[in-house]
C-alpha cells in the first residue's frame, strides 16, 4: 500500500510561483469530506458534537470550515479561547479542557459561556473563588489509573498520566458541584493517544457509560454528556489500515444501547475531541531538496527543518515522504532527509528508501495537518512557514503568511536601545 499526495507536482510548481517553500498545505475537499463522515457516523446520537482540538491546528480558516458542520472547539488556553471566539464559536460550542489552569483562563472561559472541564478535584474551590459561582453545566475529567488495554495489547498507561481525577475524587466532585448549584454534568476521559484501531472509542465508551450509570445512581446528578475526547489516530505508515469512523461510530452506538438505554439514560449526548483524526491526513509539509551530502551516509538537505515539523525529531515519529513527479519510480536509494538546525536530530527520515532525489525536487511530507505547524518554534532563529489552503476548486489560498525577521525580533520593539536590522 502506498500513500498518494492530495497535491500534484504540477500544482506545487504553480503554487511556488507565489509562495516559496517550505509551507504547510491543507486539502479543503478532504477536510470537508471527513467532517461529514464524522457527523454521519454519530448521527444516531441527536446531541453529538465534535469539538475540534484547536491545539492541533490553530488556524481560523480551518476552524471556520469545521464550523460549517456545527462542530465546536476544544480549547486549553487563553489564546485558543480568543481564536475560537474570533471565529464565531461561543457558549456550549466551546469546551475548555485545561490543566494547571491560571485563574484568568477560567474567568475568560466562563465569560464566553464555555463548558468548563475540570481536571482536578482542587479546581472546584479554585474555580468558584475565581468566577464567584459554579456554572450550571460542568464537566470533570476522569483518570481510571492502571493500564488501558485493547485486544491488540497495551495501549497506554493512564496511571502514569498527570491528567484527571480518581474515581473516588470524581464521585465526591459531582456531589460537591451539585451542592454548589451545578445542574448538568459531563464526564471526560482520554486514555490513549493515536490509536489505529476501531476498538478504542467503543471500549472507552463502555467504561465511561458504566461509570456514568453508577455516578447517576449514587449522586443523583443529571448526566448531560459523555466526552470521549481524542485518541482516534491516523495511519502514518503506508502499511497501516486506517481507522473507519463509520465502524467506530457503530461500535459506540452498540454499547450505548447496551449500557445507557437500559439505565434510562438514552438522552445522554456523545462528544468527541478528535484533533488529529480531523486534520492530520489533510495537511502536508511541502519542501524542496537544496543540498546533497555523501559521507558515511547519504543525506538530502531540504529547506524545511524540525522548526516546521518537530514530531520526527522529538518523538521519533514516522511521516511518509513522496518525491513529487517520482511517485512510480523505484525506491532504490537510501537517504537521511534532514533540515538545517544545529541539532543532529533534525531529520525527517532516517535510512528511508526513496527514489533518486535531484536538487530542486519537491518533497511532500505527509500527515502534518495536525500537530505540524502548531508545534513549530523559532530555535536557531528559524522562521515559521506559511500555511496554504488548497481549496475545493483547486485554487491555492494563503491562510497564514510566513514569518519574517521583523516578526522574530518584534518582542524587542519596546526597547529604544535595541535596533536589529540587516
Q: Predicted regions span which residues?
A:
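A charged N-terminal "starter" segment
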Residues: 1-136, 175-179, 183, 217, ...
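Conserved, mostly hydrophobic/aromatic
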Residues: 31, 55, 77, 109, ...
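Charged (often Lys/Glu-rich) extended helix/loop segments that serve as interaction or gating elements
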Residues: 260, 265-422
